[in-house]
């Protein structure tokens, strides 16, 4: 599933290539792709026609395009009040260029300059919906994103406030890193990478860690996601690509995730994998020892 760096790569591509364009046609090829838009495909299509993209936004793994009615010149328009929220799901792709002729095309939009944007989604977990913008903590976000906390790459991210929240949590630190209401954007891959860098096992209770160690984990999460962003994100297959259809290559630089049975790059111990929340956690048993189970 795309995490923060992968979504940010897509956002940057869209921001550079679709901002300022007006939508002249929309076709929904699969109803599941608009199931989150409660008014249905016809309403989504009708409302998007003639709207102009004024910008892009992201919080954590959530991506959106801000819109207006397209009637006023760009310089005289008020701030947007509605957004097209894009859920990439497990395999969603926002592709620029000619509309592809393939079975997994879900939505296609044409612009006033003759270019097109296609939403391709093999597993159909993603989709589009229109939502109003609301102001939360000084930032305009779509209503479905209002509950999501700021992510470590957000300029207004308050690391100390998040550390304070984590210190009060009687649950595993990895579980808290994946909680989008505590801190957003850190998915399974980058949680494992941050914990490996901090030499902390994900099964440790958040409340058992010191404030400096929690701050270190958050700093590592930010650093590893910046590193991934610089390499176009992490792609294990062809499902994650940027707006030009190109895969990222940070998977070659991963220190923990997916490295079960391989030597730890730091100490040489054999990396292990544990089941966790219907996912897998990868860690070094020497650098990141599991917490001891207290006997009653």
Curated annotation (Swiss-Prot):
Keyword check for Lyase: yes
Residues annotated for DNA binding in this entry: 104, 123, 169
Lineage of the organism: Bacteria, Bacillati, Actinomycetota, Actinomycetes, Mycobacteriales
Record flagged with keyword DNA damage: yes
Species for this entry: Mycobacterium sp. (strain KMS)
Gene3D superfamilies in UniProt: 1.10.8.50, MutM-like, N-terminal
NCBIfam families listed in its UniProt record: fpg, PRK01103.1
Catalytic activity: Hydrolysis of DNA containing ring-opened 7-methylguanine residues, releasing 2,6-diamino-4-hydroxy-5-(N-methyl)formamidopyrimidine; 2'-deoxyribonucleotide-(2'-deoxyribose 5'-phosphate)-2'-deoxyribonucleotide-DNA = a 3'-end 2'-deoxyribonucleotide-(2,3-dehydro-2,3-deoxyribose 5'-phosphate)-DNA + a 5'-end 5'-phospho-2'-deoxyribonucleoside-DNA + H(+)
Name assigned to this protein: Formamidopyrimidine-DNA glycosylase
The protein's role, per its UniProt record: Involved in base excision repair of DNA damaged by oxidation or by mutagenic agents. Acts as a DNA glycosylase that recognizes and removes damaged bases. Has a preference for oxidized purines, such as 7,8-dihydro-8-oxoguanine (8-oxoG). Has AP (apurinic/apyrimidinic) lyase activity and introduces nicks in the DNA strand. Cleaves the DNA backbone by beta-delta elimination to generate a single-strand break at the site of the removed base with both 3'- and 5'-phosphates.
One Pfam family matching this protein: Fapy_DNA_glyco
GO BP terms in the entry: base-excision repair
Cofactor: Zn(2+)
Subunit structure comment from the entry: Monomer.
InterPro entries: DNA_glyclase/AP_lyase_DNA-bd (IPR015886), DNA_glyclase_Znf_dom_DNA_BS (IPR015887), Formamido-pyr_DNA_Glyclase (IPR020629), FPG_cat (IPR012319), MutM-like_N-ter (IPR035937), Ribosomal_uS13-like_H2TH (IPR010979), Znf_DNA_glyclase/AP_lyase (IPR000214), Znf_FPG/IleRS (IPR010663)
Similarity annotation: Belongs to the FPG family.
Residues the record marks as active site: 2 (schiff-base intermediate with dna), 3 (proton donor), 61 (proton donor), 279 (proton donor)
Zinc fingers (FPG-type), renumbered ranges: 255-289
Alphabetical keyword list: DNA damage, DNA repair, DNA-binding, Glycosidase, Hydrolase, Lyase, Metal-binding, Multifunctional enzyme, Zinc, Zinc-finger
PANTHER family hit by this protein: FORMAMIDOPYRIMIDINE-DNA GLYCOSYLASE
Cofactor note text: Binds 1 zinc ion per subunit.
EC number: 3.2.2.23, 4.2.99.18
GO molecular function: 8-oxo-7,8-dihydroguanine DNA N-glycosylase activity; class I DNA-(apurinic or apyrimidinic site) endonuclease activity; damaged DNA binding; zinc ion binding
Gene: mutM
């Amino acid at each position: 599933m795309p995490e923060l760096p992968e979504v940010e790569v897509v956002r940057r591509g869209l921001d550079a290539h679709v901002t300022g364009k007006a939508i002249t046609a929309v076709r929904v090829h699969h109803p599941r792709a608009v199931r989150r838009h409660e008014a249905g495909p016809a309403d989504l299509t009708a409302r998007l026609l003639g709207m102009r993209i004024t910008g892009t936004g992201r919080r954590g793994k959530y991506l959106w395009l801000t819109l207006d009615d397209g009637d006023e010149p760009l310089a005289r328009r008020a701030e947007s009040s509605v957004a097209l929220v894009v859920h990439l799901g497990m395999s969603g792709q926002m592709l620029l260029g000619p509309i592809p002729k393939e079975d997994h095309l879900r939505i296609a939009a044409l612009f006033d300059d003759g270019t097109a944007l296609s939403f391709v989604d093999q597993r159909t977990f993603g989709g589009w919906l229109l939502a109003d913008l609301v102001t939360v903590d000084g930032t305009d976000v779509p209503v479905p994103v209002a509950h999501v906390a700021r992510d470590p790459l957000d300029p207004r991210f308050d690391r100390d406030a998040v550390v304070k929240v984590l210190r009060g949590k009687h649950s595993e630190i990895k579980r808290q890193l994946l909680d989008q209401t505590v801190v957003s954007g850190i998915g399974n891959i980058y949680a494992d990478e941050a914990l490996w860098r901090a030499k902390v096992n994900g099964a440790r209770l958040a409340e058992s860690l010191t404030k400096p160690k929690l701050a270190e984990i958050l700093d590592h999460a930010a650093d590893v996601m910046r590193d991934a962003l610089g390499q176009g994100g992490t792609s294990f297959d062809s499902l994650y690509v940027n707006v030009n259809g190109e895969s990222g290559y940070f998977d070659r630089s991963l220190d923990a995730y997916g490295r079960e049975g391989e030597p730890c790059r730091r100490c040489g111990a054999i990396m292990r994998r544990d089941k966790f929340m219907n996912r897998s956690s990868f860690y070094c048993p020497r650098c990141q020892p599991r917490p001891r189970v207290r006997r009653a």
